[in-house]
Design a protein with these regions (language model features):
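Domain-level signature for soluble enzymes in the chorismate/prephenate branch of the shikimate pathway
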Residues: 1-91
Length: 91
């Protein structure tokens, strides 16, 4: 983590992190596509127990890395919902 002294430096670091996040989300999307092709039925796309399992794992990681749960949980729930929509589209 870089100690920033100006808003320009802060913005540069946020932009760098955003680029990394996009790269990771693109990688995640590839696995969502694979899941859409592997699952045998459309009803298998939404798996509520799995959703809750993922959210719990994320919240554990959020705690470990001092990421606010108020940010982590809604962001991941939205990510999961959008991933499900995408998975339905490629199913």
């Amino acid at each position: 983590m870089v100690k920033c002294n100006t808003m320009t430096e802060v913005r540069m670091e946020v932009d760098r992190i955003d680029r990394e996040l996009v790269k990771l989300l693109a990688e995640r999307q590839v696995y969502i596509e694979q899941a859409g092709h592997i699952k045998g039925e459309r009803t298998a796309v939404r798996d509520q127990p799995r959703i809750e399992e993922v959210v719990e794992k994320v919240l554990h990681e959020a705690d470990r890395h001092k990421l606010s749960r108020a940010i982590a949980e809604p962001v991941w729930r939205l990510l999961i919902e959008k991933s499900i929509e995408y998975e339905y589209a490629v199913f």
